[in-house]
């Protein structure tokens, strides 16, 4: 083992960074192309980078003053200890002895090995890599000093292929923060963005330390650093190896935001657990009462909620609460820990949340964002990790336009997903979440990006998509694609699937909205959508459940707003009304926005119920949005990603106010689906499975559809009728099956509790008078 000198480095010191740069022969990029660095503003955690920007942050966050330094380095393979003195500082050889060896290339990230910790980082184009370690502080939380160590890696001894690596002995088993300075070519037009003065986050860091409290503006400039915890005992999963493993056809998915679910004071939780993983555990009884059996969590990877505060702009008042601004693909969002607990607590509490959901029979699906990162675009560049480690590998570039970032994500950059190294990172990330956190499935944001090659062109057989489908660790996971991107690659019904991939059915959303609000010419496509969208999925030899049916998702209007607004109202977003979709297929029922008109409110209530009935009787996998069970409003904002307020937060007092009406209807309708297998077949309907009570399909003005779904086992047929006309329709009811009679279960025109009666109300008439904008459901019973 070689021993090295230890230097106390003011990692907030520009002179130190410059000295390292000079020693390694690296020329800094011209200032005109300077990448915004988190090091050059106030630092909340360590203070790597330029000391000129250091300032005091929140009292609750540790501050680190500049301390004198020298830089630890290996010297031409000498076994002795060397110390390079800077700024007149010397240290004794015994003050903080560390030893190092060359290390190994795999696994990437930090790992325990015999005798120490191995650090491994990929960078194909780097010419220098420096490992930066911030050791646990001594004394109290408010201690100003910090012990910092840097290791300059040797290209001969500490590099295998494109992997830089080193083993360090004597480090604590937890509490160390680490990052890398990476230097390399300065050819911007060749795709390089190296800046060795910036300390970068390890892409394979399993835990990330950043600001302590969610959305605290005083901490906006804090950096994010990798950390690890080899001290804690393995998490006790108990019997959680028995995952729910629900059939896809049986799922009812509830899309939700961990923070927004309990952040509001009306949740009744104390301030330490509101908006946290533990807070969600407290509300599992609500999920069970509603009847959902899978939660789809908006991103819980570490993300930057204060990305809008990097520079003055019209959005700098906003806080990203949706989480589509990924910093790291392996670490859980640390600020979802209770009481500002940090990354280690976040990991443990997320596991506890998953364990408790599984105990309740609820699967956990993660919304994952592998299409872009938080590092923005070239106009407002920001360097956290990938850009400075190897921009040319990690991002799609237009090499015909000075290596500008391609933007198929709508967020400024696009991850180069099918590059072999990036592909493996994504697969490693997915396996990590399954193995370490027992996750049941994944929904892939803007998944069409994952179907593009390094030049941005669509691939017929994307390697990443295939390998996810065929991976042995992921073989039991639900994998769901959002089959479009912001570059126009719309793959609904055409997403490469290898018999595994399900899709968000965007056509279902649009066609149901148009029929229910009364658009002409929509009856036929409405019938196709509720019967499983065979036109999209049967042709590819898939199953009905491969189509995830939804009317509402986090993007766009809530269900209440869909029936309350004709236009989006996004002024609060600071984008001049240019954000959010303009084609919402919504109808305000006669008045734009809030109203006290009882007739309008009654019509809106019927329409929300109509949408929910259609969703729950459709073949395929239904998904609903958090808050729609009580009629949550965002006041017409159809792109509310940046509001850490009641606009997004679940309003528990409103749930209580509407529990006996709106909520009861939604809950009972979900339970009706669970109790009737003919509504969730694993094959497409044939002519013996359904009877369409219709003889004028070509009539474009017809807005009425009635049909019977047959139960070949017990004769429990279900009759459904949807009237999207603005007048009454007298529907002729077909005879019930032999020895059965019809029972009315649903009439959305009736007031609660008669709008849904689970046990049914006997109906004997030959006709049923169906009110305008209403739907009915009859069940055949003995």
UniProtKB/Swiss-Prot annotation:
Transit peptide, UniProt annotation: 1-68
Pfam families: Alpha-amylase, CBM_48, ISOA1-3_C
Polar residues bias: start-end ranges: 68-81
A single cellular component GO annotation: amyloplast
Keyword Transit peptide (UniProt): yes
Catalytic activity line of the entry: Hydrolysis of (1->6)-alpha-D-glucosidic branch linkages in glycogen, amylopectin and their beta-limit dextrins
Compartment(s) where it occurs, according to its Swiss-Prot or TrEMBL record: Plastid, Chloroplast; Plastid, Amyloplast
Site (Transition state stabilizer): 555
Signal peptide annotation: none
Region of interest: Disordered: 68-88
Family affiliation: Belongs to the glycosyl hydrolase 13 family.
Name of this protein: Isoamylase 3, chloroplastic
């Amino acid at each position: 083992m070689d021993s090295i000198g230890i230097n106390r480095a003011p990692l907030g010191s520009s002179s130190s960074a410059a000295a390292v740069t000079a020693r390694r022969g690296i020329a800094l990029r011209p200032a005109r192309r300077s990448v915004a660095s988190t090091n050059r503003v106030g630092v909340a955690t360590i203070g790597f980078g330029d000391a000129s920007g250091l300032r005091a942050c929140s009292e609750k966050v540790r501050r680190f003053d500049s301390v004198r330094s020298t830089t630890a380095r290996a010297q031409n393979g000498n076994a002795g200890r060397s110390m390079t003195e800077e700024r007149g500082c010397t240290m004794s050889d015994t003050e903080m002895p560390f030893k190092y060896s060359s290390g190994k290339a795999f696994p990437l990230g930090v790992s325990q090995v015999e005798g120490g910790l191995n650090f491994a980082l990929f960078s194909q184009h780097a010419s220098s890599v420096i490992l930066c370690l911030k050791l646990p502080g001594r004394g109290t939380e408010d201690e100003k000093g910090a012990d910092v160590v840097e290791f300059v890696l040797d290209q001969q001894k500490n590099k295998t292929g494109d992997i830089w690596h080193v083993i360090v002995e004597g480090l604590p088993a937890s509490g160390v923060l680490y990052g890398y300075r990476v230097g390399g070519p300065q050819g911007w037009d060749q795709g390089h963005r190296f800046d060795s003065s910036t300390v970068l986050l390890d892409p394979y860091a399993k835990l990330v330390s950043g600001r302590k409290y969610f959305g605290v503006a005083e901490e906006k400039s804090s950096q994010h650093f990798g950390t690890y915890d080899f001290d804690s005992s393995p998490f006790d999963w108990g019997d959680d190896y028995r995952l729910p493993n629900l059939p896809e056809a049986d799922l009812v998915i509830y899309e939700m935001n961990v923070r927004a679910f309990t952040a509001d004071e009306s949740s009744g939780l104390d301030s330490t657990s509101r908006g946290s993983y533990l807070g969600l555990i407290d509300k599992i009884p609500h999920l069970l009462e509603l009847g959902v059996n899978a939660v789809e969590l908006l991103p819980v990877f570490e993300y930057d909620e204060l990305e809008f505060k990097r520079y003055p702009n019209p959005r700098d008042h906003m806080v990203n609460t949706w989480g589509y601004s990924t910093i790291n693909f392996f670490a859980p969002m640390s600020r979802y820990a209770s009481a500002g607990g940090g990354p280690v607590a976040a990991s443990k509490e997320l596991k506890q949340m998953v364990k408790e959901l599984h105990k309740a029979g609820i699967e956990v699906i993660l919304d994952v964002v592998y299409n872009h990162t938080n590092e923005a675009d070239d106009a407002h560049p920001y360097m956290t990790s990938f850009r400075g480690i190897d921009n040319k590998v990690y991002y799609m570039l237009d090499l015909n336009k000075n290596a500008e970032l391609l933007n198929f994500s709508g967020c400024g950059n696009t991850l180069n997903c099918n590059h072999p190294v990036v592909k493996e990172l994504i697969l490693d990330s997915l396996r990590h979440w399954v193995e370490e956190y027992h996750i049941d499935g994944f929904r892939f944001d803007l998944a069409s990006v994952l179907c593009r090659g390094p030049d941005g062109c669509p691939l017929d057989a994307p390697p990443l998509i295939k390998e996810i489908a065929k991976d042995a660790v992921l073989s039991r996971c639900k994998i769901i694609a959002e089959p479009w991107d912001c570059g126009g690659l719309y793959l609904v019904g055409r997403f490469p699937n290898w018999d595994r991939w399900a899709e968000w059915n965007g056509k279902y959303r649009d066609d149901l909205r148009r029929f229910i609000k009364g658009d002409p010419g929509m009856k036929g496509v409405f019938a196709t959508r509720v019967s499983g969208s065979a036109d999209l999925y049967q042709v590819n030899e898939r199953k009905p459940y491969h189509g995830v049916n939804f009317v509402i998702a986090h993007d766009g209007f809530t269900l209440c707003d869909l029936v309350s607004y004709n236009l989006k109202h996004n002024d609060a977003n600071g984008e001049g009304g240019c954000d959010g979709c303009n084609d919402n297929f919504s109808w305000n029922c006669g008045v734009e926005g809030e109203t006290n008109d009882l007739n309008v409110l009654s019509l809106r209530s019927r329409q929300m119920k109509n949408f929910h009935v259609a969703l729950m009787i459709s073949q395929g996998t239904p998904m609903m949005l958090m808050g729609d069970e009580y009629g949550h409003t965002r006041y017409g904002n159809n792109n509310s990603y940046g509001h850490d307020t009641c606009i997004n937060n679940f309003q528990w007092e409103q749930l209580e106010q509407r529990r006996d009406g709106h909520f009861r209807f939604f809950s009972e309708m979900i339970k009706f689906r669970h109790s009737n297998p003919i509504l969730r077949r694993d094959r497409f309907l044939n002519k013996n499975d359904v009877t369409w009570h219709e003889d004028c399909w070509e009539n474009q003005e017809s807005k009425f559809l009635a049909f019977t779904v047959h139960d070949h086992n017990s004769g429990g047929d279900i009759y459904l009728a949807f009237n999207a006309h603005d007048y009454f329709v007298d529907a002729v009811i077909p005879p019930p099956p032999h020895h059965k009679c019809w029972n009315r279960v649903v009439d959305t025109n009736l007031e609660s509790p008669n709008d849904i009666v689970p046990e049914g109300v006997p109906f004997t008439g030959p006709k049923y008078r169906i009110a305008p904008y209403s739907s009915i459901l009859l069940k055949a019973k003995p």
